[in-house]
Amino acid sequence: MNQTNTRAVVETGFLTALIMVFTLVGSSVPFLYMLVSLLVPVTLLVLAARHGIRWSILAVITAAIVMAFFISPLQSLLQVLSVGLPALVLAYGYERRWETSKLLVIPTLVFLVAFPIEMWLSFQFLNIDLVSLWNEEFAKAIKDIEETYRNQGMLEEQIQSQMTVAREAMQQFTYMIAGASFVGVACLNYVICWIANGIMRRAGGRDLPLPGVLQWRMPKWSVYLFLLGLILQYWVNLYPYEWLNFIATNFFILGSYMLLAQGLSCLWYILHTHGYSKTMSMLLIFLSLLMGYAVMIVGMLDLLMDLRHRLAKRSSED
């Protein structure tokens, strides 16, 4: 028992030092922040899987206290909110061996709740208004587009028409941030668990089985979510409310990505059953992404008609 506790203390101390280094580098070099968002959760997952979630919590608390002396207490708290808290939830689910959907969705929701709190704290105590910064960048991008059109010698009517389209596109991009963030963080959680599995296998521990591309299965309501998003986007043309546009855009985004994942899984399954090599399958899958809507239709048919099993039955009969 003492040997186990000693090993846990030593590993926690070493991994806590790594967490502090990753976080300090990410706060000093902004473009490395994505790498920090990947490495810190992996460290906490491995620690939780080997010794329990309480050691991961201890590592986060220790790192936050020490980092408060190097940067500031508030910035240390913001790092815990943005990276530490979602990573701890993911580590807890990894240790408890949650099913894949629960393991990906719950930490993502925690991040989406923690991020507005982080924005509010940044605005209140650091005078960092991310909304104003976004609006300024939005206005600057629109101005640059207009200057580009004028330099090309376009007529005023053409410029105004194109600027209207550009403003609508930028506004739609603003609406889709929530849905795109959800998908992006969920995919990041999958990658984190995949890396943690590799480390656990090398360390002789027990990994958490994750479904590969062949086993990806989206819920059937993905089709209805996508169709509802399409219908609501049509209603936005009749009733131009911002809240309706926000809901329609994010329903459409979430449904689209879920159907895209289902379609990729179905295509990979079809190529696998026909004996294509992994290299050729990856090349064909990459080319299929150039026709995203076609892949989404394949995913929709797979959910509604069980396309992959129909093709598997035909191939076995052949």
Please name every model-derived segment.
Residues Y33-Y92, D302-M305:
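Alpha-helical membrane segments and adjacent membrane-interface helices in multi-pass membrane proteins
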Residues L58-I65, L104-F111, S277-L287:
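Central hydrophobic cores of alpha-helical transmembrane segments
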Residues A203-M258, Q262:
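Small-residue-rich helix-loop
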Residues M1, N5, G13-T16, Y241-D318:
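Long, positively charged, glycine-interspersed low-complexity recognition regions
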